[in-house]
Amino acid sequence: MEDAILRRTWAEIDLDALEHNYKVARTRIGDGVKYLGVVKADAYGHGAIQVSRKLEQLGADYLAVASLDEARELRHGGITMPILILGHTPPEMVPQLISYHITQAVSAMAKAEEYSAEAQKCGGTLRVHIKVDTGMSRLGFLVRGEHFESGVNAIAAACALPGLDAEGIFTHFAVSDMDGAEYEAYTREQFGVCTDRKSVV
């Protein structure tokens, strides 16, 4: 009986609400800032292709997904706008990344070198975004405190590798969705770390 009930449930997604939210966010970030919509995990259960089509129609600049499979699904669904893979992609998949016009996040020099080697091997150029660790302590080039100089140098070296086109830099805020002055101050500090390193590189 429980299975029958579960099969009859669904989520109804209001694309007008998505449009409203997009416009509010766009107003807050301003015209000079690019908008990237994260649609990983089937747009968090909202339907990745439908949400992506709406964001593309509204003028979003970029989409982000977790994996190559998710990126390919969007391409097969007719999505043509730039897509960034936030998660790891095995280096041997670089030819697919290039042929599908997918951008890959790079979180360490070793990964940048692997992607560079594979891109050169297939005679292409892989677009990448550099991930900076500003406090999440999950993935990314270390640039805080004593790691500043070595981190910035590593990012600059990764950006200069043949076969790679470093078109962006990003971070993952550790506590951006938590309330309170302490958390807000920490998020602002993380943002400052990322933008300071970007200006140096």
Predicted regions and their residues:
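Active-site-proximal beta-alpha core segment in soluble small-molecule metabolic enzymes
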Residues: 5, 9-12, 17-20, 33-192, ...
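Short, compositionally biased segments
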Residues: 196-198
